[in-house]
């Protein structure tokens, strides 16, 4: 599932994103954030973090640097 989500995002980056002007208000971009989140936290939590990030990417949010949160270590 993780691989599928990452492949979908990479497809977006390669085929759809070049057709639109750059509008992401964040660094890293929302699609790169999604890949990093899914690699770090897995498909479910990483996917959820990606959805939350995309919902924040609008003209009324200032944007800025928003890295993927680190995975919490289990004790």
UniProtKB/Swiss-Prot annotation:
Superkingdom in the source lineage: Bacteria
UniProt keyword annotation of Disulfide bond present: no
One GO cellular component term: plasma membrane
Keyword field: Cell membrane, Membrane
Topology in the lipid bilayer: Peripheral membrane protein
Cellular compartments annotated: Cell membrane
InterPro entries to which the protein is assigned, alphabetical: Membr_insert_effic_factor_YidD
Functional summary from the UniProt entry: Could be involved in insertion of integral membrane proteins into the membrane.
PANTHER family: MEMBRANE PROTEIN INSERTION EFFICIENCY FACTOR-RELATED
Record family assignment: Belongs to the UPF0161 family.
Protein name per UniProt: Putative membrane protein insertion efficiency factor
Organism: Bacillus subtilis (strain 168)
């Amino acid at each position: 599932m993780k691989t599928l989500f990452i492949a979908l995002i990479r497809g977006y980056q390669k085929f759809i994103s070049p057709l639109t002007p750059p509008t992401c208000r964040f660094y890293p971009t929302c699609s790169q954030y999604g890949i990093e989140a899914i690699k770090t936290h897995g498909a479910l939590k990483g996917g959820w973090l990606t959805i939350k990030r995309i919902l924040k990417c609008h003209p009324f949010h200032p944007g800025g640097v928003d890295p993927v949160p680190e995975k919490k270590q289990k004790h």
